[in-house]
Amino acid sequence: MDGRVALGTGLPCLYHYRMIRECFTYLTTPCPAPYRRMGYLRECVGIESRYRRNRKAWASHLEESRTLMLEAAGQCTARDTVLVFGAGLLHDIPLADLLGMFRRVILADLLFMTPARRAARREERIELVTLDVTASLTSLAEGNTTLTQPTAYLDDPSISLVISASILSQLSVVPNLYLEKRFRQSEAESEQLGQALVRAHLNYLGAFECPVALVADEAHIIRDRSGAETATVSALHDVPLPAGGRSWDWDICPLGEIDRDHSVMHRVRGFVGF
């Protein structure tokens, strides 16, 4: 086989390998049936695949996130338990450092990919908790968009730090796609639900008596091949974040990830003490 034939077959083979890997991950990742039906496992597998394709582009964002979380942890006077919302993938969570600073680490999410499950098997101080942080997915799955205000862990005195790890802008993504497809929810209704979910999570974080660290996408920025911004869209359905914190950019979709002519950057805001 000459070099040109091998080059010509390489990309299809790589594509097929990725498809097989995603399919295997989907089939072997534990996920409660209601969340699987809504599309959460599919979304999580997709994010994991995008991370593998864009590991270098994501590196600075992940490091910024970890640094902020550790700064928040370092300011805690109590060192019992750290509760992390959105820990199913672990890419942005400085798990080893948190274990060195706290007695226990609770990783809370709807489902957990292999690295999180492996870490919990190896370290008994890690607890995986399957948690609907919105407290509303059961009703949303039935088409009822009246939200329930979450209260999980608010009365737990052992919680020394809460971290909300890049989930604020994601809370509405799967529910809205599901409701639009299953119940023909309108665009305006999706926007209203998105705003309600964002506000509910911010209120939930504000109800904790312990320190809270927040990392959240604030805006989606679309750029053309020259790097010029062509559009900027709120990632939080126009719900404003409080003043303060720090800001950085996440090169989530470099050129070629979506198409050859556009890239997508997320503007991220982080709060050491939300």
What are these regions (language model features)?
Residues R21-C76:
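Class I SAM-dependent methyltransferase Rossmann-like catalytic core
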Residues R79-L90:
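Conserved class I S-adenosyl-L-methionine
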Residues L89-M101:
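Conserved SAM-binding loop of SAM-dependent methyltransferases across substrates and taxa
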Residues R122-D155:
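S-adenosyl-L-methionine
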Residues Q149-Y153, S160-E180:
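A short SAM/SAH-binding and catalytic strip from SAM-dependent methyltransferases
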Residues Q170-V198:
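Mobile active-site "lid"/loop adjacent to the S-adenosyl-L-methionine
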Residues P211-D217:
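Conserved beta-strand signature within the Rossmann-like core of class I S-adenosyl-L-methionine
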Residues D217-F274:
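Charged, low-complexity C-terminal accessory regions
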